[in-house]
Amino acid sequence: VITHRVQYLTKEYGIDPGDILVITFTRAAAEEMRERYEALTGGGSRVTFGTFHSIFFRILKLAYRYTADNIVREEQQMQFVRELAQAGGLEPEDENEFAASILSEISSVKGERIALEHYYSKNCPDAVFRQLYAGYEEKMRRAGLIDFDDMMVLCLELFTERKDILSAWQRRYRYILIDEFQDINRLQYEIVRMLAKPEDNLFIVGDDDQSIYRFRGAKPEIMLGFERDYPGAGRILLDVNYRS
């Protein structure tokens, strides 16, 4: 659906391929769409295909000179939380499972834009979680590292504080298409809404019955409320599986 829509925009409306941004949730899906589009059009393209994280990190690289070395590795994250738990005298049955659960909750807090004082942990007392969260952020800052959620947080802050930079990216990508929209979280959606202005040329594809990232804070209700946020939007229901 997405690839044919891109082809339609460029062929029928003469839209510059360089003005089009296609976003999905995995590198494999982004690469597959790129290949499908190039097969449709018979060659390379200036359309940008990427994941939320790759697009946001590209923006941060240009603004702040980040490199891949600034991205924290999963094992580093786990070690940070294990060290904090030990320093706090915590004795979970399984250190790795506990660390992974805490990291998932930290991701939810960031991705859902939840005030820390309003978040209730499922894995430890709330005061303990807040200490772990603050300690994790401090370790990351001292090491000069960012995680995948930080990419989005920093991008939102950049767009909010630097309207000139936001305006430049709005001019760069005048048409935004998003696949698997049911997997979007609140932070990603806020950035997309900012990026899509002032023309609001958004095209989304999703199935609210198939969200696979609920554990990461995905909110299918964002898709269900899309027409409320964009009253002029049209809806097309597909009853054919185009991937089979």
What is the role of each PLM region?
Residues 1-70, 167, 221, 233:
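P-loop NTPase Walker
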Residues 44, 65-150, 173, 235-241:
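ATP-hydrolysis module of ASCE/P-loop NTPase motor domains
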